Amino acid sequence: GLFDVIKKVASVIGLASP
């Protein structure tokens, strides 16, 4: 769902930030 997409984006951002 939409929330899953948000969590995925949040995960990518978390991995991208040092």
From Swiss-Prot:
It holds the Pfam family Antimicrobial20. The keyword Secreted applies. Keywords: Amphibian defense peptide, Secreted. Expressed by the dorsal and submental skin glands. It is found in: Secreted. The keyword Secreted applies. InterPro entries: Aurein_antimicrobial_peptide. Transmembrane segments: none annotated. GO terms for cellular component: extracellular region. One of its GO terms (biological process) is defense response. Its main location: secreted. This is Citropin-1.1.3.
